[in-house]
């Protein structure tokens, strides 16, 4: 029979293993959604960043996407602009800066429809938990994201 510290270690490992499995499935899902939308997964990730963080400079997009070549982000933004997903505009505060902004109409709306089933499935799953449990789950997810962000930065630096 497991002692309490052993049971805790096992649960921590189970949570970690499940997190990695879910992350892998998420990558595969994003590849599939990008394919359905006729874009590549880097372009899809760019749209996801703009959706969650709002307008960003090309430099900030490149850093967040892990693109190291200067022309790579230009190619991503050019493709997305031609397809109607984003537009370039001037920063209202510093007119010298260019911001890339998500265009929520048109092709992006169709992309959101593809993601609708996942969003509904998550809402159904969340219904199984109390508000207090969801608060804990959200806190863990935010903190796990921070761990992943820091580990990714460490890898890029090394």
Segments from the language model and where they lie:
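N-terminal helix-turn-helix DNA-binding core of bacterial DNA-binding proteins
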Residues: 31-68
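Alpha-helical linker/hinge and terminal dimerization helices associated
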Residues: 22-29, 114-125, 144, 148-151, ...
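N-terminal leader segment of winged-helix/HTH proteins
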Residues: 1-41
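Helix-adjacent hinge/juxtasegments
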Residues: 56-89
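Active-site phosphate/pyrophosphate-handling residues
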Residues: 45, 71, 135
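Charged, amphipathic alpha-helical coiled-coil/dimerization segments
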Residues: 79-135
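C-terminal regulatory/oligomerization modules of transcriptional regulators
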Residues: 1-5, 134-158
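Charged catalytic carboxylate motif
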Residues: 14, 18, 117, 121, ...
């Amino acid at each position: 029979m497991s002692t309490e510290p052993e049971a805790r270690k096992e649960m921590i490992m189970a949570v970690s293993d499940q997190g990695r499995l879910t992350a892998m499935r998420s990558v595969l899902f994003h590849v599939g959604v990008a394919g359905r939308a006729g874009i590549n997964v880097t372009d899809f990730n760019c749209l996801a960043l703009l959706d969650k963080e709002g307008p960003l400079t090309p430099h900030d997009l490149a850093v967040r996407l892990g693109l190291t070549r200067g022309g790579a982000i230009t190619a991503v933004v050019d493709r997305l602009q031609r397809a109607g997903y984003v537009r370039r505009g001037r920063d209202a505060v510093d007119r010298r800066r260019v911001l890339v902004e998500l265009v929520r109409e048109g092709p992006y709306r169709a992309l959101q429809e593809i993601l609708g089933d996942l969003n509904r499935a998550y809402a159904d799953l969340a219904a199984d938990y109390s508000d207090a449990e969801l608060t804990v789950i959200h806190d863990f997810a935010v903190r796990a994201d921070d761990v992943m962000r820091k580990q990714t930065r460490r890898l890029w630096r090394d």
